[in-house]
């Protein structure tokens, strides 16, 4: 099977499971059923060795990136008089709401479900899921395995984190904005060097998105490039 066919099959399969409602996002606490806990979902990040280069954004995409940056350093997410949950999915939902885009459109309000998965589903239906090599300002960036949601000690937790792309640096490092426990900050990801945190001259290629914990299983990764799942570009 070709790489493109494999990616397509994986995306369709993942979307089917998302619509079945078995995944959880970065800020939820509802546990999966015992049956779904036993399911082994392929969650190894896609390595984009030719990624990434910056594509010129249309005005709405540029506005999304600028809005995301304005939230850096803040702990509250309020847009148009409405407050959003101070987690990763709430953050990106608020950013997109600034351009009158509801990332939960047609999916109902989140009630103990999966925020990141719902946004992924929206992007599949109303945009494009891809792996580069070009990235637009305001694109969404999805990650797997940023925490052990199902508690089984294995790196089999899909779509656990999300951020908004700000820009791509000349060396291919993607700068994105996201909300973690320490607030809304900028982070870096370099898919050409996914296993490198910092170079010998001090440049950061990949920030840590997962905390190291006692008992982490074999194959557990921690850097943004290692945990990368996909990009999402909304249709114009």
Tell me what each language-model feature is.
Residues 2-13:
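Bacterial N-terminal signal peptides that target proteins for export
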Residues 3, 26-27:
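Cell-wall glycan-active module
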Residues 27-34, 151-236:
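Aromatic- and glycine-rich peptidoglycan recognition patches
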Residues 13-22:
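Bacterial N-terminal signal peptides
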Residues 54-55, 104-186:
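...with weaker cross-activation on analogous glycine-rich loops/strands in unrelated enzymes
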Residues 27-109, 219-236:
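N-terminal capping segments
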